[in-house]
Structures are given as structure tokens and as C-alpha cells.
């Protein structure tokens, strides 16, 4: 490894260490705030909600990062990359829409299951409506990863962690359980805003060429990464 590459690697590792440390500290503070303002029952409800949203998010992008990044790196031509991007985005977009419909259609039942009450069903409807933002943000993050913009990725993680922590703290103190639920539900929108800011001067937007670039060859290859 050359001196230049070694220097870059050390910088990336240092930034990553700082980001992990900051996220760890923010996590500890966040847990303490939630425990004080929500109590044991509120923390249990938030844990249930996190599990619920994690399941839907995992289904929405299952195999995305592995498949997209692998194919993107293997294909150097811009036109091929546009086809890969459009094909993956359309496929996972359809999966996300199905997940969104399920979340919205059974919101009352989910609310009863998670919170032992259906009075929070509107938050689960909101989650379903905003789920596509999560999928889109995951695509942009995968695109940064595929382009090996590791420093930008680490900076994005750091900034988004601070932003979400600030909103979580404010709304949890101000509105207790409803505030904490709201931020958990809309956190992906905040993350998307941060991601778009980091990508504002990036060539990533060259890959947005609508549905005309969908290639069924890549759609078939996606199934290999779903297992």
C-alpha cells in the first residue's frame, strides 16, 4: 500500500472512530432522557415501535446494498449504471409501496399490538406514508458507498446522528411519548434531507433518468441478493 493510500485510510479510520464515539455518547444521553421522560412503559413502547419499523425497513431494502453496490462497482459505464440504478429503484420501490400499504391498512391493529391502544394508529399511517423516503435515502447512501465516498458517508452519519438526537431530545422533553414516537417515525425524512445536502454537488443525480432505463436483466439478477 502506497503512502498516499495509507494516509487516506488512516484519515477515514480516524473519522470513523470519532463518529462511532459521538454516536455512542449521544446514544447514552438519549437513553437517559427517554428513561426520565417516558418511564419504563414508554421505553417498552418505543422498543416495540423500533422493532416494528425495523422489520418493515428491512423488508423494503432486503438485498439492496449487497446487490446494488456489487453491480455498480462491476459496471463502469455511466449508461449501465443508470440502468442498474433505475432497475433497483423501481424494484425496491414496489416492495416499499406494498409495505407502506400494509402499514397504513392495518394501522389500528399495529397500534394495538405495539402500544396496547389504537390511539397511536395515526403515527403508523404516517410511518407508512414516509417509508419510501427511507428506501430512497438507502439508495443514496448505497450510491455513496459504491462510489467509495467513505469520508462523506462517515460525515453524513455523524451529522444525521446529531440532528436526530437534537430533535429527539426536544420533542421527547416537550411532548413525552408522542414526541418520541413522532421523531422515530419521521427520522428517515431528516436523514434524507442530510443526505441530499451532502450529495448536492455530487454526480449521483446523473443516475436519475426515470423509468426508461429499467433493464429486466438486472431485475432478474436482484433475486440472487434476496436470499
What label would you give each PLM region?
Residues 8-66, 96-100, 104, 161-165, ...:
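Signature of the first transmembrane helix
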Residues 28, 32, 59-62, 100-108, ...:
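Membrane-embedded alpha-helical segments of multi-pass transporters/permeases
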Residues 31-32, 60-76, 145-146, 203-204:
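Helix-loop junctions and terminal segments of transmembrane helices
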Residues 101, 105, 116-140, 154-158, ...:
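Alpha-helical transmembrane segments of multi-pass membrane proteins
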Amino acid at each position: 500500500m502506497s503512502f498516499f493510500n495509507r494516509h487516506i485510510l488512516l484519515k477515514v479510520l480516524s473519522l470513523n472512530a470519532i463518529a462511532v464515539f459521538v454516536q455512542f455518547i449521544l446514544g447514552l444521553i438519549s437513553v437517559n432522557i427517554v428513561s426520565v421522560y417516558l418511564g419504563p412503559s414508554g421505553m417498552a413502547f418505543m422498543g416495540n415501535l423500533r422493532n416494528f419499523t425495523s422489520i418493515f425497513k428491512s423488508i423494503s431494502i432486503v438485498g439492496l446494498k449487497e446487490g446494488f453496490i456489487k453491480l455498480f462497482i462491476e459496471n463502469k459505464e455511466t449508461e449501465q449504471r443508470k440502468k442498474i440504478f433505475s432497475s433497483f429503484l423501481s424494484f425496491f420501490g414496489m416492495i416499499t409501496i406494498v409495505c407502506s400499504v400494509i402499514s397504513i391498512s392495518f394501522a389500528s391493529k399495529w397500534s394495538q399490538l405495539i402500544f396496547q391502544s389504537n390511539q397511536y394508529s395515526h403515527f403508523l399511517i404516517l410511518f407508512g406514508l414516509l417509508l419510501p423516503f427511507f428506501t430512497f435515502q438507502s439508495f443514496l447512501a448505497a450510491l455513496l458507498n459504491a462510489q467509495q465516498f467513505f469520508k462523506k458517508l462517515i460525515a453524513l452519519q455523524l451529522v444525521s446522528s446529531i440532528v436526530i438526537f437534537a430533535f429527539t431530545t426536544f420533542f421527547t422533553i416537550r411532548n413525552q411519548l408522542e414526541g418520541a414516537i413522532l421523531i422515530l417515525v419521521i427520522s428517515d425524512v431528516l436523514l434524507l434531507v442530510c443526505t441530499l445536502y451532502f450529495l448536492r454537488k455530487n454526480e449521483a443525480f446523473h443516475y436519475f433518468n426515470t423509468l426508461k432505463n429499467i433493464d429486466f436483466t438486472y431485475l432478474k439478477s436482484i433475486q440472487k441478493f434476496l436470499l
